[in-house]
From Swiss-Prot:
<dbReference type="InterPro" id="IPR002429">
    <property type="entry name" value="CcO_II-like_C"/>
</dbReference>
<dbReference type="GO" id="GO:0042773">
    <property type="term" value="P:ATP synthesis coupled electron transport"/>
</dbReference>
<feature type="binding site">
    <location>
        <position position="204"/>
    </location>
    <ligand>
        <name>Cu cation A2</name>
    </ligand>
</feature>
<keyword id="KW-1133">Transmembrane helix</keyword>
<dbReference type="InterPro" id="IPR011759">
    <property type="entry name" value="Cyt_c_oxidase_su2_TM_dom"/>
</dbReference>
<keyword id="KW-0249">Electron transport</keyword>
<keyword id="KW-0679">Respiratory chain</keyword>
<protein>
    <recommendedName>
        <fullName>Cytochrome c oxidase subunit 2</fullName>
        <ecNumber>7.1.1.9</ecNumber>
    </recommendedName>
</protein>
<feature type="transmembrane region" description="Helical; Name=II">
    <location>
        <begin position="60"/>
        <end position="87"/>
    </location>
</feature>
<dbReference type="InterPro" id="IPR036257">
    <property type="entry name" value="Cyt_c_oxidase_su2_TM_sf"/>
</dbReference>
<comment type="function">
    <text>Component of the cytochrome c oxidase, the last enzyme in the mitochondrial electron transport chain which drives oxidative phosphorylation. The respiratory chain contains 3 multisubunit complexes succinate dehydrogenase (complex II, CII), ubiquinol-cytochrome c oxidoreductase (cytochrome b-c1 complex, complex III, CIII) and cytochrome c oxidase (complex IV, CIV), that cooperate to transfer electrons derived from NADH and succinate to molecular oxygen, creating an electrochemical gradient over the inner membrane that drives transmembrane transport and the ATP synthase.</text>
</comment>
<dbReference type="InterPro" id="IPR034210">
    <property type="entry name" value="CcO_II_C"/>
</dbReference>
<keyword id="KW-0999">Mitochondrion inner membrane</keyword>
<dbReference type="InterPro" id="IPR045187">
    <property type="entry name" value="CcO_II"/>
</dbReference>
<dbReference type="GO" id="GO:0005507">
    <property type="term" value="F:copper ion binding"/>
</dbReference>
<keyword id="KW-0472">Membrane</keyword>
<keyword id="KW-0813">Transport</keyword>
């Protein structure tokens, strides 16, 4: 989860988020090198009055600064397309959970079970227990098995919402009349927090998401107790 004064991304919990972190570092290094080169050239231009007459109208230089940016863009585009393909790929999910956005709470339905559904509201500040997080805790957590492919079906009952959990690299729009889907897989147990990431009204900031990733045996006991 995020920490105060954090400047980097959250720790990766899913394979997709690990790929996104690698892509972020890859792109950031390219941007850093380009920025350093531009700043170096600007500093040289500002500190010298000499002019290289051979580069004022050189076809070779124009060819280089046309081809080189194209190569750099390809170096950025190819990893990006690979990750986009991975995020859209869905292979035989072990569990399907339907998520509906409301003003201003989430409802969840485990479609593989009968009558396993609940609403998830933010826990008011005055009801928080010691150690719980303000504006991030909910009354009903989404309990899911770890190390399994889970499909999330996401839609909305009223206005636009967005279901996002940064540690898992997830952000999917909840659109009325449309059913979007995404997959997740957590590699370790724990609590993972997210929030609605689409402005949806006055209480937009009070729609937290809490995923509790647990071993399969614990999930089976939990699901049996909920039925």
């Amino acid at each position: 989860m995020a920490h105060p004064f954090q400047t980097g991304l959250q720790d990766a919990t899913s394979p997709i988020m690990e790929e996104l972190l690698h892509f972020h570092d890859h792109t950031l290094m390219i941007v850093f090198l380009i920025s350093s080169l531009v700043l170096y050239i600007i500093s040289i231009m500002l500190t010298t009055k000499l002019t290289h007459t051979n580069t004022m109208d050189a076809q070779e230089v124009e060819t280089v600064w046309t081809i080189l940016p194209a190569i750099i863009l390809i170096m950025i585009a190819l990893p990006s397309l690979r990750i986009l393909y991975m995020m859209d790929e869905i292979n035989n999910p072990s569990l399907t959970v339907k998520t509906m956005g409301h003003q201003w709470y989430w409802s969840y339905e485990y479609t593989d079970y009968e009558d396993l559904s609940f609403d998830s509201y933010m826990t008011p500040t005055q009801e928080l227990k010691p150690g719980e997080l303000r504006l991030l805790e909910v009354d009903n957590r989404v309990v899911l098995p770890m190390e399994m492919t889970i499909r999330m079906l996401i839609s909305s009952e009223d206005v636009l919402h967005s279901w996002a959990v940064p540690s898992l690299g997830l952000k999917t729009d909840a659109i009325p009349g449309r059913l979007n889907q995404t997959t997740l897989m957590a590699m370790r147990p724990g609590l993972y927090y997210g929030q609605c990431s689409e402005i949806c009204g006055s209480n937009h900031s009070f729609m937290p998401i809490v995923l509790e990733m647990v071993p399969l045996s614990y999930f089976e006991k939990w699901s049996a107790s909920m039925l």
